[in-house]
């Protein structure tokens, strides 16, 4: 498949992060591409609670699906320790990390701004034993590249988890750093809490 711009989100008070009033709506081109699925149960929507439709939505806080893809727990702490100094004033950590560190969350979505942040960097692959052994160099790189999975439910939580992509050469990379045609298999790796 090919990636498409599906939705635009606008936070009125970025200093309040996910607690900010939020307006959101599907992109017209995306709706036209999926016209036969508008307002159907199994549409290619960002969430079952936000079906494809032509209306703009508004909530007093971020839509729930964002909590499922934003870094949380161990991933959030690690990322803020590493890149927190880059956070602009006037934006809370959750929005900063959403825009910076979610190029490949679980599911069929990507945060476009996070993917653009990572473009131009050289991809570094790791052998399976480095991943299994939780090699520090590997973990730091994986977190920095957005392979760490956050969120309050599902794949998120406190235990470190990573989405990885395996290349034809057998090396493992944080998901989204390799072009889709270079990937032969995807891996979801969950480490113990300690």
Give the residues covered by each predicted segment.
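Phosphate/dinucleotide-binding and metal-coordinating scaffold of catalytic cores
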Residues: 1-194
């Amino acid at each position: 498949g090919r990636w498409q711009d599906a939705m635009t989100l606008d936070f009125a008070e970025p200093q309040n992060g996910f607690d900010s009033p939020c307006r959101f709506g599907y992109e017209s081109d995306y709706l036209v591409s999926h016209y036969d699925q508008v307002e159907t149960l199994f549409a290619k929507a960002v969430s079952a609670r936000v079906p494809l439709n032509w209306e703009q939505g508004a909530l007093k806080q971020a839509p729930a699906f964002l909590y499922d893809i934003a870094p949380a727990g161990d991933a959030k702490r690690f990322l803020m320790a590493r890149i927190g100094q880059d956070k602009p004033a006037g934006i809370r950590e959750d929005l900063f990390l959403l825009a910076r560190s979610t190029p490949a969350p679980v599911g069929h979505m990507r945060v476009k701004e996070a993917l653009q942040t990572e473009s131009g960097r050289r991809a570094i692959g790791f052998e399976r034993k480095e991943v299994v052994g939780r090699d520090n160099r590997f973990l730091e790189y994986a977190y920095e590249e957005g392979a760490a999975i956050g969120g309050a439910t599902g794949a998120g939580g406190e235990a470190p988890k990573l989405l990885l992509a395996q290349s034809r050469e057998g090396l493992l990379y944080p998901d989204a750093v390799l072009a889709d045609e270079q990937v032969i298999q995807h891996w979801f790796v969950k480490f113990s809490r300690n």
